[in-house]
């Protein structure tokens, strides 16, 4: 591993630990030449997950886009960043554990909605309004009515 400070390729590992539920390794390293310390991460590289958009375009799955959408829905809600990280991790894990290397964007949206409905109902409605492209107040009311019915049948 090259030192990011001086470029030397002689570094020693001071500490290693598993992170992200054992799917990655965090290593604390020290340069043999300049003695500066830095952190590296090793992660298993899987074949990319491809998202098929509504219009048929294909693009590589972006964990960042998934997280940004959930963060937007949970803005100013009593939802911790840890809960959001867990949600993103679980959704991504579910997508990657499937047998398909291509996934419809609709499946991702539904997975987010299924998770948000249990986490925070306001965040669920916010996400649904964008994902399902609510055009008017009536559509909001319909979704709220469905949510109340689901809640009362539990």
From Swiss-Prot:
Stretches assigned to the ATP-cone domain: 49-139
- Known cofactor(s): Zn(2+)
Q: Which residues form a coiled coil?
A: none
UniProt zinc finger (unnamed) residues: 3-34
One annotated GO molecular function is:
DNA binding
* Kinase as UniProt keyword: no
Q: Which Pfam families match?
A: ATP-cone, Zn_ribbon_NrdR
GO biological process terms on file:
negative regulation of DNA-templated transcription
Cite the cofactor comment. Binds 1 zinc ion.
Superkingdom, taxonomy of origin: Bacteria
Q: Which UniProt keywords apply?
A: ATP-binding, DNA-binding, Metal-binding, Nucleotide-binding, Repressor, Transcription, Transcription regulation, Zinc, Zinc-finger
Give the record's family classification: Belongs to the NrdR family.
The record's function comment reads: Negatively regulates transcription of bacterial ribonucleotide reductase nrd genes and operons by binding to NrdR-boxes.
Supply the NCBIfam families for this chain.
transcriptional regulator NrdR (TIGR00244)
> What name has this protein been given in UniProt?
Transcriptional repressor NrdR
Q: Which gene encodes it?
A: nrdR
